[in-house]
């Protein structure tokens, strides 16, 4: 069984507190995660000034200086740092930081200008396709034509996602149609769907992580696992990798 890339999506759950962000990076490594991920975008432009999520985003999206500090810390403790980039201009920053790969969020699959800029880097891409139809995914793949390593992640864009809303048959459909590695980006506060996805051949998994699952702390908390749960999830995945047949 191919080794599964496990991504700890810290996202907005560090609330603009650098000390907390570093603690979460360290805990992600202790859990066995391969990658810690943040989000880079301009909140007012993406969400609009009347969005109920704007306050969370403005404190949870790193500034350039914060992104540098967090990347340096991740390098120091030897865990890969990655970001979902929502603007073509921010690719210059991530290239300066020396990221190894790019994560493309579901909402960015239609942004061909962004995808073409990422294509220029020729670095591996992990792309969530939960909001896209076949035409949109095909166009995105065309924009990424120079990228040799692409993984497409099935996800359900409900926050949080109930188990009954998840259809893992789509993993097989994505794999067959696009001949790529497939994965699962979960917004479900349970580990069973992710384990089922790995059993169905997912080679990349992504999950939001948080210190405490208290909804009032932030908009991503209800979709997150705490670190005890995340460690258990990765432990089960590593056990599954050792199974034969």
Residue ranges: model-predicted function:
Residues 1-245:
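Catalytic cores and adjacent flexible loops of soluble metabolic enzymes
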């Amino acid at each position: 069984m191919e080794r599964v890339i496990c991504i700890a999506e810290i996202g907005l759950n560090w609330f603009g507190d650098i000390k907390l962000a570093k603690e979460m990076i360290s805990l992600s490594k202790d859990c066995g995660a391969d990658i810690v991920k943040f989000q880079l975008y301009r909140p007012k432009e993406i969400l609009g000034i009347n969005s109920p999520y704007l306050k969370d985003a403005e404190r949870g999206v790193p500034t350039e200086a914060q992104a540098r500090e967090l990347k340096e810390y991740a390098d120091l403790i030897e865990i890969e740092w990655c970001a979902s980039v929502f603007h073509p201009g921010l690719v210059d920053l991530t290239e300066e930081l020396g990221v190894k790969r790019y994560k493309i969020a579901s909402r960015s699959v239609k942004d061909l200008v962004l995808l073409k800029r990422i294509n220029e880097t020729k670095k591996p891409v992990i792309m969530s396709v939960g909001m896209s139809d076949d035409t949109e995914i095909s166009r995105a793949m065309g924009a990424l034509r120079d990228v040799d390593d692409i993984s497409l992640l099935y996800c359900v864009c409900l926050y949080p996602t109930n188990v009954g809303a998840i259809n893992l048959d789509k993993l097989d459909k994505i794999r067959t149609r696009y001949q790529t590695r497939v994965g699962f980006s979960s917004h479900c506060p349970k580990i069973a769907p992710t384990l089922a996805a790995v059993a169905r051949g997912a080679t990349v998994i992504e999950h939001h992580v948080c210190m405490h699952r208290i909804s009032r702390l932030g908009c991503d908390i209800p979709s997150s696992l705490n670190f005890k749960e995340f460690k258990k999830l990765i432990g089960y995945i590593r056990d599954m990798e050792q199974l034969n047949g």
